[in-house]
Amino acid sequence: MTKEEIIKPENLVYKKPTLMNDNAMHYCPGCSHGVVHKLIAEVIEEMGMEDKTVGISPVGCAVFAYNYLDIDWQEAAHGRAPAVATAVKRLWPDRLVFTYQGDGDLVCIGTAETIHALNRGENITIIFINNAIYGMTGGQMAPTTLVGMKSSTCPYGRDVELHGYPLKITEIAAQLEGTAYVSRQSVQSVPAIRKAKKAIRKAFENSMNGKGSNLVEIVSTCSSGWKMTPEKANKWMEEHMFPFYPLGDLKDKE
């Protein structure tokens, strides 16, 4: 029997977004990237922007994002995604333009590009995946690594006197005049996924309505980098990440 014969249209309650193709994802088990990709695809389809969306992919775990979502993509040099997005949006103001970046790409090497694009009020959206570690390169300390959190480059835990404090880029973004909507969400549960999708939708709509820059941070896990099972990683995130990176809207300029 075919899939269509097994699952009748009248009984179908959920299906994969059309924009997500059948390529096998390279992400580790338990990774949040796949869920966020799905949310982005759903929002784009619901907005009817399938043929008018440009994503800017980063250097990092999501470097191959263009293999999974059938929209127009542009690869950017490490940390320069907001600058590339600025150019694309200014050339094509009718396009929905977003960047998809991790904490290393956005908060470390790309800090300048991020801050200045947001401060200028560019009509773009930044999707920021914060798992507090460098996942692609083997689990090194990131700018967002928590105090006391261990990594391959701080095996005894992040030391404030040696490494400084974790950088809360989302709080900084909320203080900038050019930002319209700044939110921090997660995708570790069904209610959280629904809230994250709502935040992404609002950010994308703001971008298309010329309200200014938008940033949606997704606090995430990295089972491989944290050396935990997906289940333990989710629990650790709730107990340690959420208190330092509290969820919710930080700014909503109506």
Predicted features along the sequence, with ranges:
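Thiamine diphosphate
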Residues: 1-135, 198-202, 209
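Flexible, low-complexity linker and terminal segments
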Residues: 1-13, 17, 22, 208-254
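Conserved thiamine diphosphate
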Residues: 15, 142-209
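Structural motif
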Residues: 52-55, 95-98, 123-127, 171, ...
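Glycine-rich beta-alpha junction loops
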Residues: 59-61, 131-133, 189, 218-225
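Short, hinge-like loop/turn segments at secondary-structure boundaries
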Residues: 71-74, 117, 142-146, 232-235
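Active-site-proximal loop->helix
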Residues: 111-116, 136-150
